[in-house]
Structures are given as structure tokens and as C-alpha cells.
Amino acid sequence: MAELLPGYSPSFKKPSEILRLSRRRSRSEASKTGLSPFSPGDVIKRVPGLRPFSPGPNKGAGVKRRNPFASLENTVCSPVKRRAETVAEYGAASLEPRALSAVRPSCLGQDSPEPPQFNSVEDVIWGDPLAADADPLVKTESPEKPAPACEIPKGSVTFPADWSLKTRLLFTSSHSFSWADHLKAQEEAQGLVMQCRATAVNLPHSIQEPKLSTDLRCAFQQSLVHWIHPSLPWVQLFPRIGVDRKMAGKNTPWSQDESLQQVLMSEWALSFTSLYNLLKAKLCPYFYVCTYQFTVLFRAAGLAGSDVITAVMSPTTRGLREAMKNEGITFSQPLVEDDTGKKQKKPEAASQGDINPEKENGTAEADEASDESDEDESFSWLEEMGVEDKIKKPDSISIKLRKEKNEVKLDHKPESVVLVKGTNTFTLLNFLINCKSIVAAAGLQAGLPPTLLSPVAFRGATMHALKARSVNVKTRVNSGYKDQFSLEITGPIMPHSLHSLTMLLQSAQRGSFSAGLYTHEPTAVFNTPIHSQAVKEISADLQNCGLHPCTVEQLTQVNELGKLSLRHLEMTDYRYTWK
């Protein structure tokens, strides 16, 4: 082939000769510049994890490009090579491969980091120190890896107030609840006295041995106590809505005895009045009135962002609302007003609950007049056609029923919630005492007065305690089992009890637990905001209301849940998350 083609050289058959000529050329160039020659192979041996390049001298551009088809195993440094000693100093800066640019400061006698290490494919691609336009002193990082920012702790140090009544709480934690079992007689007695005297207990941030903490166990007993009227141990007094089946077979001697019913109602009226007087004096923060049809929540001034006494009633019917209007009770329906989306601003007196009945009646009459005129206009086309006598027009009664159809649709729904403010709450008190429809006339609850629930003692009240039970179970995790501890609380659980229990568990369970909350559905709407707009915080003088100062601080907040309620509560690292 060499003889047939002039200029053809079979030098490729002798690579050793080519390498010898390359080394000779390198030594000659180094001798001219006065630098000590070195072999690229020596650099490869001394640099840990550096893959050998293709043979040949450096020409012109200086550095051979990395083979893009090379195996990653030849490129990525192994953990053993990462711990190799740092590359020694090199004198030939002009002949130094750009792969050693990260160690150039050491050649200048300065402190430098360790040789570049590749931990992933992205580091090899984006962090390649051989990039032609890369600064030798700056490491290029992957654009897909943003700089790590300071992590903001999730959750909040507290949770919003939930004014709904709960029927069951289920706490779970990785730490045992054995400290809540088998209270000693002295601890139980001390807890009852602490509740009667409204003694506030401040526990440490974390308790190492909860079972040995007497203060914790006494405070736990204190948080379970509530007051109720009437007290009939063999009859379920909460909840009262939709529980007729559970009361089947119970002995109810008052159902057929009118004299006994009168005695029960007179005692109930005294207890109800006593509770309202305590509320007005800010010695009771709130209380509930539970009937077989609806539930009423009375709150003292300063709670839920209101500077006056408020009462929330749900669910209601059109007949009940009409009866309240006839008694002169001024009320509002927050959810109905929100749904209509009225653009006109209400006067300030209306926002405070002092609505002028004359103006309200005048507005209603004007609306009725306009509706009647609309009805007359809607039938004018019949007269034009001359058939007005042949077609039967709807009478005034049917027109009125059609107008009231929208009001009837709200009955027994959350949107039927009614809000009463200020002095109208006292009128509501008298209305409920004298209203016969709040007591069932027939059925299993016939003649039974409504249930009064309060966090503090009142006239005719009986002290009750929530039922607590701890259970230890093993849950399967991967290939083994893990201990899971739970604490179940049942009974009429009011807002102060929920907050008190979470404060205790925060210390006893070292800031790590979760809770499932089971809401009495008719009361979930009690979280409806009182004000349509945000209001300033109100300083509430409720130091003597019988609750812990931290609990009072939570209950004074403006409602944030709307017509919803808390279903799940979780604490992690002493911070709450909920849904």
C-alpha cells in the first residue's frame, strides 16, 4: 500500500515510535522555556480519581477534551480515592492540565480545598472543572440544585379556638399514656379541689417521668371536670339531638306526670338564670343549652372578638325565627348574609346588633310593596290579550308561600344559624324559659328539660367528669412491630377541656402527639365569625372566669374556622398543625 500510494505512511503500525517522538518534542519545548518536564502519566498517578486521557502531547489549545462516551466508573472517584492525599505542587503552570485548576492555590503556597469530588452524575456533568469558560477558583454547580435555605419550622405554637362540642377525642403518641391511669385518691381529690377553686397549674416544658409527676396527674383530673344540669345518671343528657333510640327502655317517670315536669322546669329555670348572671358578671366564660331540636351557645363579653355578650343558636326553623321576632328579639343570620353578598354597607348600629325594629319593618314593607307591584305587572300582559278572566290568577296566599319558600329551605341546615348580641340575649333567655316548644311533648324525651353545660359551677349543677381510657397496641412497621399508645376521652367535651388537655400532653408527651376530634355536627357552625370584617383585639377582663389564662387567651381570638370545625390535630416538635 505504501508503494502504491506515495505519501502514505504506515506509522500507525508503530505507536511506540510515535510516543517516543512526542516525549522528545515535549522535552525540547520544556528545555526552551526553562521549565522542568513532566509526564501527563505522572499527573494521572498523583491525582486521585482522574481518568487517563487519550495519549498524545498538548498542542495549541493545551488540554485534551474528556471523552463523552467514557464509563462513569472511570470518572467518579471512589470513597477510598477521596481520602487520598492532596496533589503535590507542580511547577509547570502552563502545562498543568485544567483538571487540576481546583488545586492551583496550593501551587501558589495558599490553603486550598481538597481535590474536586464527584458524587453523582449531575456533579460530573455540571460541576466539570474542565469547562473552557469556567473560573478555576469557582466551582460550577448544577442549576437544578438551588442553594439550601434556612428551613422555616412548620406549624404554629397554638391552634385556633373551636367552639363546637366534641363527643370523643382520640390521642395517639409514641410515648406511653400510663401516667393518666389509676389516679390515686389524693390526686383525684386534689384535682377536684383545683377545679372548684380555679387553680391554674403551670407545668414545665417537658416532663421526663410523667407517671411520677403529681402536678400533672392532678391537672389531668382537673381538665376532665365539667358541670351539668339536670343530673339523671340513667339517662343520656348529651347529645340531645337524634338520640331517641339510645334512650329506648329507660325509665322516664316525668313523661306522664305533669306536676313532676313543672318541678323539673322550675329548677331548670333557676339554674339557667344563675348561669346567665355568672356570664354577665364574667365569672363564667360560656355555657351551652342543649335541647332536643337545637343548641344555644352563650359567650361572655370579650370572647370570640366581641365586646358584648353573644348567643349563637343552631339549627333553627322558620317557625322558631318568627317566634323570636314576635318576642322582639333582634338577631342576624351571618351565613345567609354572606351568601347574598350584599354590596350596601350596613349602619354601625346594625353591626353591633342594635337594629331598629321600625326601620327593619319599614324595609320589609317596602319589599313587600315592590313584590306586589311586580306581581301586578307580571299579569298585565293577560289584560292586553283579553284573557285575564279565563286564566286563574294565583291568590295572595300562594304568592306569600312562594316568597317564604327560600326561608323554609334553610330549616335544620347550618345556614340557619342565628346570632343574638347585647341586651337581646337577656330577651332570648326569657324567651327560652317561657317557650314550651323547647321541651318535647311526646316521645322518649317528653317532659325532659334541656341540658345545661358549663365549665364552672352554678346553682343546681352537678359535677361530672369525662371518661378517660388508655390503650397500648403494636403496629406493624416494615419487618417489625412498633408500640403505639392511645388515650381516649369521651363525653361532652367543651373548648376549654380540649385546650387544657393539649397543654398537658405537650409536656407529658414531649411535644409529639396527634388527636382525632369527633364533633357534634349541629354545633360545628358555632365557629362562624361574628364580624364580617377583621376587628381589633379586645382586652377581656376574664381573670376570674375559672379558666387557665392561656385558655382564655385562645378563646378571645376571632373565629377563624368559619362553619367548619377541627377534625385532626397534630403536634410535632412543640408546633401544631390541623385540618
UniProtKB/Swiss-Prot annotation:
This is Protein downstream neighbor of son homolog. Component of the replisome complex. Signal peptide: none annotated. GO terms for cellular component: nucleus; replication fork; replisome. Residues 339-348 have a biased composition (Basic and acidic residues). It is found in: Nucleus. Keywords: Cell cycle, Cell division, Developmental protein, Nucleus. Replisome component that maintains genome stability by protecting stalled or damaged replication forks. After the induction of replication stress, required for the stabilization of stalled replication forks, the efficient activation of the intra-S-phase and G/2M cell-cycle checkpoints and the maintenance of genome stability. One of its GO terms (biological process) is DNA replication. Residues 1-68, 331-379 are annotated as: Disordered. Residues 365-378 have a biased composition (Acidic residues). The keyword Signal does not apply. The keyword Iron does not apply. Belongs to the DONSON family.
